[in-house]
């Protein structure tokens, strides 16, 4: 692939790591953010120490606060901003962009109030004449590992296979490999909903439960993620892939996962307010829990783990009581769909 110019919107941990991947592949990378101190740090010291204390970025990675300058003549735009501001940033892009570009996103969540997937938001806010079919970049990927060029394999999903293949070639190299998929609904819902299960898995660890319990929540969590995804139109096969069970394993078992760490702290008795204050990063699983719970209620999808975590986070239910309720639910067959 010849050199491309890519705007990365969001200088967080994942946006920074993906910027390095693109730079390693010889592309021109422009990071956009709205914190002048952070942008100045990236340009002056080639660091982003809030997320990576010991990493020095290539000096060819340039950061901007001016969106128009960032988007000038770009071939592709990658959204890596928190879910709650995706619509706002998309509106700003639509007002600024003056040519057609490949539009990608690598965020994982559902819009809190509308319960919409992020590709839907981008489709609504960015006119068709300015964009491709949206490409979702998702899968088992800790930024802390990708930034040091550890092996990472994820998925590029788009309704248009050719566009997904463009993104596959854009990112793939000797340590970072993408597979294509056309099941956008499946890939997006898997990436969003696994954060909820990761909070639950972390809570079990914080409470002192062992590996048996952690394996159970991942397996049963995958089952309810799949139920909701299929109700929305996804293929159940997607959930057995990288963006499904792969992402759930890496997020639901690792200290690198902020959602897992948040759950662990909840299990140890910390308040949600203290957890969010101490984390210093967005915990997508918190807001996604409410969106997924409300969506499941609307569609009549059985999601007992999500419901339990929702009750703990939003109604103050004791975690041990929530676990007790799940363990005393009506008996079911493992492959029962409801």
Swiss-Prot record:
Reactions that this protein is recorded to catalyse: sn-glycerol 3-phosphate + NAD(+) = dihydroxyacetone phosphate + NADH + H(+); sn-glycerol 3-phosphate + NADP(+) = dihydroxyacetone phosphate + NADPH + H(+)
Pathway membership: Membrane lipid metabolism; glycerophospholipid metabolism
PROSITE patterns, sorted: NAD_G3PDH
Location in or out of the cell: Cytoplasm
Known function: Catalyzes the reduction of the glycolytic intermediate dihydroxyacetone phosphate (DHAP) to sn-glycerol 3-phosphate (G3P), the key precursor for phospholipid synthesis.
Coiled coil: none
Gene designation: gpsA
Gene Ontology CC annotation, any one: cytosol
Active site: 194 (proton acceptor)
Gene3D superfamilies linked to this entry: N-(1-d-carboxylethyl)-l-norvaline Dehydrogenase, domain 2, NAD(P)-binding Rossmann-like Domain
Binding site for sn-glycerol 3-phosphate: 108, 139, 141, 194, 247, 257-259
Annotated source species: Streptococcus pneumoniae (strain P1031)
Name of this protein: Glycerol-3-phosphate dehydrogenase [NAD(P)+]
């Amino acid at each position: 692939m010849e050199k491309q110019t890519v705007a990365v919107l969001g200088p967080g941990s994942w946006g920074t790591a993906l910027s390095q991947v693109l730079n390693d592949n010889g592309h021109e990378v422009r990071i956009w953010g709205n914190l002048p101190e952070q942008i100045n740090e990236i340009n002056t010291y080639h660091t982003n120490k809030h997320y990576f204390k010991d990493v020095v970025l290539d000096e060819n990675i340039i950061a901007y606060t001016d969106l128009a300058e960032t988007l000038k003549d770009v071939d592709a735009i990658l959204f890596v901003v928190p879910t709650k501001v995706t619509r706002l940033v998309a509106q700003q892009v639509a007002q600024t962009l003056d040519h057609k570009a490949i539009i990608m996103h690598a965020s994982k969540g559902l819009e809190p109030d509308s319960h919409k997937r992020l590709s839907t938001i981008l489709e609504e806010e960015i006119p068709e004449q300015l964009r491709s079919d949206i490409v979702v970049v998702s899968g088992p990927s800790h930024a802390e590992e990708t930034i040091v060029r550890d092996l990472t394999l994820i998925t590029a999903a788009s309704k248009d296979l050719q566009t997904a293949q463009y993104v596959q070639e854009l990112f793939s190299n000797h340590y970072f490999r993408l597979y294509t998929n056309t099941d956008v609904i499946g890939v997006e819902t898997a990436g969003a909903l696994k954060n909820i299960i990761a909070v639950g898995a972390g809570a079990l660890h914080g409470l002192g439960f062992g590996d048996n319990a952690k394996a159970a929540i991942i397996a049963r969590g995958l089952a309810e993620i799949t139920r909701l995804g299929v109700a929305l139109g996804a293929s159940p096969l997607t959930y057995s892939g990288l963006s499904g069970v792969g992402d759930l394993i890496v997020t639901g078992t690792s200290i690198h996962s902020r959602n897992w760490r948040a759950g662990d702290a909840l299990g140890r008795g910390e308040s949600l307010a203290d957890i969010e204050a101490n984390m210093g990063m967005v915990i997508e699983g918190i807001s996604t829990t409410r969106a997924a719970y409300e969506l499941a209620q609307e569609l009549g999808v059985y999601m007992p783990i999500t419901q339990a975590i929702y009750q703990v986070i939003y109604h103050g239910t004791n975690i041990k009581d929530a676990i007790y309720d799940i363990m005393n639910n009506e008996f079911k067959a493992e492959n029962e769909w409801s």
